[in-house]
Swiss-Prot record:
Modified residues (Phosphoserine): S46, S49, S117, S196
Cross-link named Glycyl lysine isopeptide (Lys-Gly) (interchain with G-Cter in SUMO2), sites: K26
Residue span(s) of domain GYF: 281-339
MF GO annotations: ribonucleoprotein complex binding
Species whose genome carries this gene: Mus musculus (Mouse)
Designated name of the protein: CD2 antigen cytoplasmic tail-binding protein 2
Alphabetical keyword list: Acetylation, Cytoplasm, Isopeptide bond, mRNA processing, mRNA splicing, Nucleus, Phosphoprotein, Ubl conjugation
Modified residues (N6-acetyllysine): K44
Gene3D superfamilies associated with the record: 3.30.1490.40
GO biological process terms, semicolon-separated: mRNA processing; RNA splicing
Subcellular location: Cytoplasm; Nucleus
Length: 342
């Protein structure tokens, strides 16, 4: 308890009063005195004192390297010289995007990461993996897949004959079906036949497969010529089922019947056909007289024609032409070297 100092005047002073001197109180800043002697707190205290203490402890353990502490840095000079960019040797760009610790490890600033705000509105719990779609194959796709399936030569020829008119070429049939495809009357009702676009696609697919087999002149062939090809394939198939093979041509015989030369045997037909269908080899047809109404014989392979020419079966020569392309010019067999085509 503070002591009070009391002084008394003289006895004769009747008007004297007691003079009491009270020490003045010292105003102290509570914030400044927080760390002073006798204070309960060692430093500044606030509501975030716990976080501040953690930051102070972390800063003591994790030292950030200042750019001034790095030796050998250069100041920026010219931005470029002669079209070549000049970059000064310093850490200015790195310090803008991150920082180094005392050990030299580099850390990017987390604030620099770009985040799309719309991702926060997505409920990932409701998102489910989409099951695979079961593709339903339509009728048109099924027909397209069937059209691309490799077919035999006989099936191709039969399909072409079904779509062609008498004395009509494949190219002419394509023009006819293509012209009718856009008309209103293209769909034939009650006839049982598909409409013109479907027939056009089928004809185009069959012709493409014929070209892929090596028959490049199929677009100029008529229906009658394709029928002759199909007939030749049918004779070959019938001959393969015959258990009794026909007599082969005797090359050492003194005389050979003209009918044997005109009608190819199954062995000759097998040589005339390629590995599967006979559309890869160069085929020939010939006639004995160079007239428009002369009968044509064939088709025969180049090897068979060369054999007959070498053995003298055509002493006066015959008039030959290639089967592909159709409508070619006839030449005498004496002027043709069939070995060039074998």
């Amino acid at each position: 308890m503070p002591k009070r100092k009391v002084t008394f005047q003289g006895v004769g002073d009747e008007d004297g009063e007691d003079e009491i001197s009270v020490p003045k109180k010292k105003l102290v800043d509570p914030v400044a005195a927080a760390g002073g002697p006798g204070s309960r707190f060692k430093g500044k205290h606030s509501l975030d004192s716990d976080e501040e203490d953690d930051d102070e402890e972390g800063s003591s353990k994790y030292d950030i390297l200042a750019s001034e502490d790095v030796e050998g840095q250069e100041a920026a000079t010219l931005p470029s010289e002669g079209g070549v960019r000049i970059t000064p040797f310093n850490l200015q760009e790195e310090m803008e995007e991150g920082h180094f610790d005392a050990d030299g490890n580099y850390f990017l600033n987390q604030d620099a990461q770009i985040r799309d705000s719309w991702l926060d509105n997505i409920d990932w719990v409701r998102i489910k993996e989409r099951p695979p779609d079961k593709h339903q194959v339509s009728d048109s796709e099924e027909e397209d897949s069937l059209g691309q399936t490799p077919m035999s030569a006989q099936a191709l020829l039969e399909g072409l004959l079904e779509l062609l008119l008498p004395r009509e070429t494949v190219a002419g049939a394509l023009r006819r079906l293509g012209a009718r495809g856009g008309g209103k009357g293209s769909n034939s009702k009650g006839t049982g036949r598909p409409n013109s676009p479907q027939r056009l696609d089928r004809l185009s697919g069959l012709a493409d497969q014929m070209v892929a087999r090596g028959n490049l002149g199929v677009y100029q062939e008529t229906r009658e010529r394709l029928a002759m090809r199909l007939k030749g394939l049918g004779c070959r198939a019938q001959g393969s089922h015959d258990p009794t093979p026909p007599p082969s041509l005797d090359m050492f015989a003194e005389e050979v019947a003209e009918g044997e030369l005109e009608t190819p045997t199954p062995t000759q037909r097998e040589e005339a056909e390629s590995a599967g269908d006979g559309l890869m080899d160069v085929m020939w047809e010939y006639k004995w007289e160079n007239t428009g109404d002369a009968e044509l014989y064939g088709p025969f392979t180049s090897a068979q024609m060369q054999t007959w020419v070498s053995e003298g079966y055509f002493p006066d020569g015959v008039y030959c032409r290639k089967l592909d392309p159709p409508g070619g010019q006839f030449y005498n067999s004496k002027r043709i070297d069939f070995e060039l085509y074998t």
